[in-house]
Structure formats: C-alpha cells, structure tokens
C-alpha cells in the first residue's frame, strides 16, 4: 500500500471547494509519457495553478503502474525545483471501469479515482460507485463518477451517442453514492471529432465546422439541484485549428476535426464546473510539432530534437488553458 500523501500529492476535495467558490476550473491534463508530464508541470509551476495529472486505464498500461507512481512523486519534486514551493498536484485515474482497477490505483498512490458506471443501469451505477467510494474514502482518496453518457472515442472509452445527464437524478445519485464530484453530459464528447458534420453549421468564409452550443440549461438545472457540488466536464478539448492545419499540411488526415469553443469552456468554468478535462488538444499539439520537425528535417533521428519541440508546444498550450480559459493561474501560490 502506497499513500499518495507520502508522494507529496493532494486529493481534490479542498481545491474543488475553492474553485467552485472562486469561479474558476482546475485543469485535468491527461498524460502518457515524460514529455507530456514535464510540460504540464512546467506550465503549472510557472502559473502557480493547481493541476490534475490524469491517467486513463490505457495510459496506465502503457506507462506501467510502478513507473507512474515514481513519475508522480518526481513531478512533485520537479515542481519544487522550478520554484513552486507548495505544489498542489493530484494523480487521478480517468474512466476507471471496475472496482478492481480503482482499488489498485488507490493502493498504488493515486489521490483521486473516477469510477465510470455511466453505461450501467442506474441502480448498478450507484452500487458500483458506492463500493469504490467506501474503499477510497478509507484512505482519504476522492472519487468522481459520471451520470449521463458522452459520445465519441478516446483511449478505451467509446460511445455512439451522448445522453444528457438528467437533473432530476443528481440529488439521489450524489446522496446515495457519497461521491466527491460528478461528471455530467451536456454536449461535450471524446476525441478530436466531437461533432458530426450534420450536427454543425459551416462557416461560409473558412469552410470550417461550427459546433452547436453546450446545454447550459441542463448545467444550470443541476446547479440548482446540487448547489456548490463539484461538477466535472469530460471531452472538453477545443481542437485548435492551427494544430489541425499543421498536421494536415505535413501528411496527416484530420478533415473536419472540431472541438468545444473556448468561450463556452470559460462560461462553464465560472459555474460549478470545477474540473475540465483536456486530452486531445495536447495530442494534437504534440503531433503537429513532431510532424513539422520530420517534414523540415527529414534526416533527423534524435528523439530529443523532435520530442523537445513537442514538449515546448504542449507547455504553451497548457499555459494558455490555465490562464486564458480556466482561470486557475495564481490559485496555488
């Protein structure tokens, strides 16, 4: 048993309470490798922003659970090295699909876990979540759950259609499960193709897809039912078109990739939404930078020469999200 407290990590309880009260959101950045982790810590330390390091089941398998533990501990020490005296860093399991996986993560030093029973019948989702909560809370690990289903494909999470969260269910669900935060569905979705062309309009000047607005009416109803309760948005990458253009320019094929407009995320961050998940954007930043290096320097084969620029581009992206979108800068001095 490894306690996250021994690794220098924190859980989400206090940071979420501050975020809801302060009208900003905590960035939850998914990572798979060292360069992504370095970029996240560099940006967070520079901006003094609390941050959630998210690891999916697939990323955990890719990076290895033992290495992840030491990467997280190293991230805390690296943040201090960069001058962040009191780093507020969470290690979070994203989309845990079983009690066994959540338990394993708690036992290996995660400070927060998500149990995703959203595809289960309502009562089964409650029972599974409650079981995870009871185990995690014994070790002061916080638990996120999802009510409603997001469409799209990202990592090992896939669904054909989204189903909005039903506001009338949230009080019963949160009360009976004891979860610490609730991921809801209001129109976000996973992956770089968050909307089908038929769901969008098309800008006549640029030819780009314009996505439909999020269902803020559903969010506001949920806020009324659960005032002050921490709400989470998944699938909230904006799919920056400059990265899509670079990828396509240098041999990629991402036609009509479209994400969540940042002005809608800014609006969400001012509400009870205190955690916003971002994964695809960093993948796009990394891929765009690597493709550009390979195209401009076809003889290059030193990984540092293409992963270094990728890391730098991701850092710029993370800083932009922290400062210009979520408003979490300066909240973890």
Regions found by a protein language model. Give the residues of each.
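A C-terminal functional module that forms or caps the active site or interfaces directly
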Residues: 258-259, 273
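Short catalytic-loop micro-motif centered on adjacent basic/acidic residues
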Residues: 26-30, 91-92, 114, 231-233, ...
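Alpha/beta enzyme core
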Residues: 10-21, 34-59, 65-86, 95-230, ...
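Short acidic/histidine-rich active-site segments
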Residues: 235-238, 258, 278-282
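A short N-terminal beta->alpha junction/helix N-cap motif
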Residues: 3, 24-32, 59, 305, ...
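Extended, intrinsically disordered, low-complexity segments
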Residues: 289-333
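Generic N-terminal amphipathic, Lys/Arg-enriched alpha-helix
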Residues: 1-27, 300-301
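Shared catalytic-loop signature of beta/alpha-barrel
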Residues: 53, 60-64, 265, 274-298, ...
């Amino acid at each position: 048993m490894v306690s996250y407290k021994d690794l220098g990590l924190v859980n989400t309880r206090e940071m979420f309470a501050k975020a809801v009260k302060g009208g900003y959101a905590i960035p939850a950045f998914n990572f798979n490798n060292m360069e992504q982790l370095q970029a996240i810590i560099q940006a967070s330390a520079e901006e003094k922003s609390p941050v959630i390091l998210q690891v999916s089941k697939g990323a955990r398998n890719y990076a290895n659970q033992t290495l992840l533990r030491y990467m997280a501990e190293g991230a805390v020490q690296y943040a201090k090295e960069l001058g962040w005296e009191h780093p507020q860093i969470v290690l979070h399991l994203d989309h845990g699909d079983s009690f066994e996986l959540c338990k394993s993560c708690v036992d290996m030093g995660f400070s927060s876990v998500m149990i995703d029973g959203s595809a289960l019948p309502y009562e089964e989702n409650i029972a599974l979540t409650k079981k995870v909560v009871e185990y995690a809370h014994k070790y002061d690990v916080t638990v996120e759950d999802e009510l409603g289903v997001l469409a799209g494909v990202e990592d090992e999470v896939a669904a054909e259609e989204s189903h909005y969260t039903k506001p009338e269910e949230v009080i019963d669900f949160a009360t009976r499960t004891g979860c610490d935060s609730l991921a809801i569905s209001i129109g976000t979705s996973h992956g770089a193709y968050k909307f089908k062309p038929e769901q969008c309009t098309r800008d006549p000047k640029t030819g780009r897809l314009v996505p439909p607005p999020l269902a803020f009416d559903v969010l506001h109803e949920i806020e009324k039912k659960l005032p002050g309760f921490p709400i989470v948005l998944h699938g909230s990458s904006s799919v920056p078109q400059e990265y899509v253009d670079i990828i396509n320019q240098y041999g990629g094929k991402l036609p009509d990739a479209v994400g969540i407009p940042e002005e809608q995320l800014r609006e969400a961050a001012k509400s009870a939404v205190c955690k916003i998940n971002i994964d695809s954007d960093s993948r796009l930043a990394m891929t765009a930078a690597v493709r550009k290096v390979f195209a401009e320097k076809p003889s290059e084969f030193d990984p540092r020469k293409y992963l270094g620029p990728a890391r730098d581009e991701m850092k710029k992206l993370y800083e932009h999200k922290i400062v210009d979108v979520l408003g979490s800068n300066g909240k973890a001095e």
